[in-house]
Amino acid sequence: MCIRDSSVVKLDKKKADSKVKRWNMISESAAKQSKRSIIPEIMPVCTFNEALEMSQQLDVKLLPYECADGMAKTKKIIENLKGNESIGIFIGPEGGYDLDELSKAKEEGWEEITLGKRILRTETAGMMLMSVLMYMNEK
């Protein structure tokens, strides 16, 4: 979760830490229940620039964006995944990305993808994309 000046939700450090801890417990529990060998990790609350810095070591960086090119590009990117890469997913804020953020993310190797015609809630977009990635890369 990235804190931005335009963020609607304002979290203090204590609340943010407790939310991340809770989300990671949910992620671990869900992974065990579904017999996943890899547990998705929820990173600490940070600024947008800190998130870009943390993402430098990732193999694949996916940035769902409502104005991204059509499904063909997204499908190709997902189909070309080998299944053993480290993948980062950058879910946008309630109000969307601003152009400066998009530009910085692209400079750092993030690929804009689309999740379709509908604009999903922040809470569901990540789960939707994780589900698609798991389905497409099931071995």
Residue locations for each model-derived region?
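A C-terminal functional module that forms or caps the active site or interfaces directly
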Residues: 84-104
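Generic beta-sheet signal
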Residues: 45, 64-66, 115
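Short, acidic/turn-prone active-site loops that include or flank metal/cofactor-
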Residues: 67-69, 94-95, 117-120
